[in-house]
Design a protein with these regions (language model features):
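Non-ligating segments of multi-cofactor redox enzymes
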Residues: 1-507
Length: 507
């Protein structure tokens, strides 16, 4: 057993209001610069829908993640090393800019400087890549916002597998949900295996996956290898970039920017201990529907003295062990089992988990489409949302999702009985395998949690990872990553790089 610690995140989709504050603040901090205009390290999608980039979940098209071979081993879906090298100059699995969207701005100055006309002046769109006029905006990162667009296009959502989507199409307002997405910082990241340059690595001390900008050569195999399509190519610098989990803030014990600014307070951050020796075993199970339970099995109980002793021997510091004891992520994923990984069938063992939304169940119950099982709506009779959520979160296995939804409904029924009727009904908790105290704890964390309850982040011990004395005087003030400016001035063929300038409209 090799104990490692990871900063993990849980997002409670039951509280997400789709305001995109997380996306905008992340964009302003990390990707508001040349070459990354189209990139959103954090974006919020409306489901059902094909998402951003288009059909990112369709691995038959993009070949992201891992696949299990006949001998029981796993390899990246894009192929073994020889196939990666064979396609290194012509990658057939690479999304194009139109699969994301062509970033644009508007001729705002025309509004100020236009001469007097009979009609109001209009700010027309212009490409941020070429600087040319765009006649029509074709797509965007939230194009399907609130079920926007035709159902014929949104029905390509792969989570409709096994779902009667024709019935959903007739009643397409039956349910919708918001899905905020960011890099999963997986335990078994496919992007690390796909990179020919070895530029991507997973930090041992906190599990954050990063790209070494000095090693990156822009081969973009990582873009294909990532099944969540959360690595972006910077066309200006010639490097790949991704969500860095705001590691400078994490090291200081502060939450990520998206978590800090979340209006709905849906995000939770905490430490999870896991057995690094069992990662391959968990990712290689034969049945995809067993991957969720396999990942749970490698998480280690921070209350176990044997685990704590081994963690200390493996270099996990005391403040991290104390944080693991108070981790809200551990409580939701392991104690209450109401949080689930996004598409575990990709075999990457993702570490950003989601609490499924109750809105489809409550909407159906209020409209009389499903009955009540005692105090709670009958979750299992609502086939379409349940199967859809199972395809999204547990590789199609409905039982864990149904139990998680029932426990959240039980929490509501229990607290309603306690606060409105003044009756503490333990039978509600017992029906879903909990007790009254666990329901109270769930309510405290998931409904009214304080800041320090949602974000249990220990400070980093950088002194254990590098010798600062040896680095003295090696780097002055610089912009970018370390001593690297983050830009490559000559282009691929040696001539000076041409910066795109947005032309002014002259009248």
């Amino acid at each position: 057993m090799k104990v490692r610690a990871q900063i993990a995140m849980v997002l409670n989709l039951d509280k997400c209001i789709g305001c995109h504050t997380c996306s905008v603040t992340c964009k302003n901090v990390w990707t508001s610069r040349e070459g990354m205009e189209y990139a959103w390290f954090n974006n919020v999608e409306t489901k059902p829908g094909i998402g951003y980039p288009k059909e990112w979940e369709n691995q038959d098209r993009w070949n992201g993640g891992w696949r299990r071979k006949r001998n029981g081993k796993i390899e990246p879906r894009i192929g073994a090393k020889w196939r990666v090298l064979a396609n290194i100059f012509a990658n057939p699995d690479l999304p194009e800019i139109d699969d994301y969207y062509e970033p644009f701005t508007f001729d705002y100055q025309h509004l100020q400087k236009a001469p007097e006309l009979q009609a109001m002046p209009v700010a027309r769109p212009r490409s941020l890549i070429s600087g040319e006029r765009m006649e029509k905006i074709e797509w965007g990162p939230n194009w399907e916002e609130i079920l926007g667009g035709e159902f014929a296009k949104r029905s390509a959502d792969v989570n409709f597998d096994g779902v009667q989507k024709e019935i959903y199409g007739q009643f397409e307002n039956t349910f919708m949900m918001y899905l905020p997405r960011l890099c999963e910082h997986c335990l078994n990241p496919a992007c690390v295996a796909a990179c020919p340059s070895g530029a991507i690595y997973k930090r041992e001390e906190d599990g954050i996956v990063l790209i070494d900008q000095d090693k990156c050569r822009g081969w973009r195999m990582c873009v294909s290898g990532c099944p969540y399509k959360k690595i972006y190519y910077n066309w200006s610098s010639g490097k790949s970039e991704k969500c860095i989990f705001c590691f400078p803030r994490i090291e200081a014990g502060q939450p990520t920017v998206c978590s800090e600014t979340c209006v709905g307070r849906i995000r939770y951050l905490g430490v999870v201990l896991y057995d690094a020796d069992r990662i391959e075993e968990a990712a290689s199970v034969a049945d995809e529907q067993d991957l969720y339970e396999a990942q749970l099995s490698i998480f280690l109980d921070p209350n176990d003295p044997a685990v704590l002793d081994q963690a200390r021997a493996d270099g996990v510091t005391e403040n991290w062990l104390e944080a693991a004891l108070r981790s809200p992520v551990w409580k939701m994923a392991m104690d209450w089992k109401v949080a689930f990984p996004l598409h575990p069938e990709y075999r990457t063992l993702p570490m950003v988990w989601y609490v499924p939304p109750l809105s489809p169940i409550n909407a159906a119950a209020e409209s009389g489409k499903i009955g009540f099982d005692g105090e709670m709506p009958d979750v299992r009779s609502l086939r379409i949302p349940l199967q859809y959520l199972a395809n999204l979160l547990t590789a199609g296995e409905e039982e864990p999702v149904a139990l998680g939804l029932e426990r959240m409904l039980a929490m509501r029924a229990y607290m309603r009985s306690k606060t409105v009727d003044g009756v503490i009904d333990e039978s509600i908790a017992h029906r879903v395998g909990l007790d009254g105290q666990m329901i109270e704890d769930m309510y405290q964390i998931m409904a009214i949690a304080n800041y320090e309850d949602r974000f249990v982040i220990p400070t980093a011990h950088r002194e254990l990872d590098e010798d600062a004395f040896d680095l003295r005087g090696s780097c002055g003030f610089s912009f970018g990553n370390g001593c690297s400016g983050g830009t490559t001035e000559p282009n691929l063929f040696g001539s000076p790089k041409k910066h795109v300038k947005t032309p002014m409209e002259v009248r």
